[in-house]
């Protein structure tokens, strides 16, 4: 089956007259109505056959496309973001609510293929991400990505340039905790590759090799709190999980991720992890770095419902994301006193001493997604 400029073949060697010829014959056939009808019927037959052929071609193309997608989906079991921050939605549509986000270089497990891919992030959250915003990988490709030398962005924002020159065009923006493959170093730039193969250069003052970073990253309360406070002023965004914007649990999740620790994504999940602490009236049994939870208190007929979380920083103060990331206080004498949150305070969870002792609080060098 083929097509050229003059003839459309329904079968090999059986041409049907082209439309221009038929139109000319119809226009010039003035001898009789019978001749006009014959030409008219020939045109109808031609157009009908053309439509049949078009439908057949579309069906074949669709089948080939679907087969290719199925074959790729059968082998591609991982998805890695190719933009600095990728939105993950509750449904396969732009209008669906944003549930969470993933960072460039972060491994995600594919649950369902399609134009919108259903994925699971390292913290166990699931949702739909647009196919074009990720690089799908096979098990072998995912292993290669994880095993390769990588750099991790260590400043809030940075740029990957097309050349080792800050005046060259931008390849991509990146944010804290984005990961890129390390290809080499040229003067004061790391030569890097994004998951989709694009290459560029990032200033060495904006990133560190993962190997060196892991030697110095700390999981103590002082370090976690310092990072949390460094995010003060970031805007609140539902589903936000990056240094561009965060919701309450996304703030906690991001703060810990900057220290290479993966926590559950949502406040209701975080409230079940670690050592449970019923908070003393004078807050004396809280320690800096504890997670403090807020929401609806339990009643005789309803259990407590967690809807907010923050990080306790000591002296009856906590840092959290509500409208924006800021510090609030449980002390009525403090200028930062937060009566609203004090009235809905529920309990605390202690997680820092339990890093790598329970599966829900794990450094990424031991996480299955990063070590696959």
Predicted regions, residues:
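Aromatic- and glycine-rich peptidoglycan recognition patches
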Residues: 166-168, 208, 305-372
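Beta-loop motif signature
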Residues: 81-108, 153-182, 236
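Bacterial N-terminal signal peptides that target proteins for export
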Residues: 44-54
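Boundary regions of SH3-family modules and the immediately adjacent low-complexity/disordered segments
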Residues: 69-75, 121-152, 165, 193-227, ...
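Bacterial N-terminal signal peptides
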Residues: 53-63
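Active-site nucleophilic cysteine motif
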Residues: 228, 240-259
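...with weaker cross-activation on analogous glycine-rich loops/strands in unrelated enzymes
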Residues: 263-327, 333, 364
């Amino acid at each position: 089956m083929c097509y050229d400029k003059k003839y459309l073949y329904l079968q090999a060697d059986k041409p049907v007259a082209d439309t221009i010829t038929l139109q000319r014959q119809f226009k010039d056939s003035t001898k009789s109505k019978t001749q006009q009808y014959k030409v008219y019927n020939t045109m109808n037959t031609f157009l009908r056959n053309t439509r049949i052929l078009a439908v057949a071609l579309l069906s074949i193309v669709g089948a080939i496309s679907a087969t290719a997608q199925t074959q790729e989906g059968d082998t591609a079991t991982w998805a890695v973001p190719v933009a600095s921050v990728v939105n993950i939605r509750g449904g396969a549509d732009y209008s669906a609510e944003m549930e969470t986000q993933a960072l460039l270089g972060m491994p995600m497990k594919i649950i369902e293929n399609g134009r919108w891919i259903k994925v699971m992030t390292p913290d166990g959250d699931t949702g739909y991400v647009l196919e074009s915003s990720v690089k799908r990988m096979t098990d072998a490709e995912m292993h290669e990505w994880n095993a390769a030398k990588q750099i991790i962005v260590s400043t809030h924002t940075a740029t990957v340039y097309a050349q080792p020159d800050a005046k060259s065009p931008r390849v991509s923006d990146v944010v804290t905790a984005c990961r890129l493959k390390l290809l080499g170093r040229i003067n004061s730039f790391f030569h890097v590759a994004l998951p989709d193969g694009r290459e560029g250069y990032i200033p060495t003052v904006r990133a560190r090799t993962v190997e060196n970073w892991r030697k110095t990253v700390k999981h103590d309360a002082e370090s976690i709190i310092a990072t949390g406070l460094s995010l003060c002023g970031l805007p609140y965004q539902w589903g936000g999980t990056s240094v561009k914007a965060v919701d309450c649990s996304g703030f906690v999740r991001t703060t810990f991720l900057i220290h290479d620790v993966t926590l559950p994504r949502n406040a209701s999940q975080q409230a079940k992890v670690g050592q449970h602490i019923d908070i003393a009236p004078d807050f004396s049994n809280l320690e800096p770095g504890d997670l403090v939870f807020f929401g609806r208190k339990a009643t005789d007929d309803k259990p407590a419902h967690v809807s907010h979380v923050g990080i306790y920083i000591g002296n009856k103060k906590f840092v959290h994301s509500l409208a924006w990331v800021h510090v609030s206080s449980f002390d009525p004498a403090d200028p930062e006193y937060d009566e609203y949150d004090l009235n809905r305070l529920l309990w605390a969870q202690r997680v820092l001493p339990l890093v790598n002792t329970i599966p829900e609080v794990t450094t990424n060098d031991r996480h299955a997604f990063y070590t696959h």
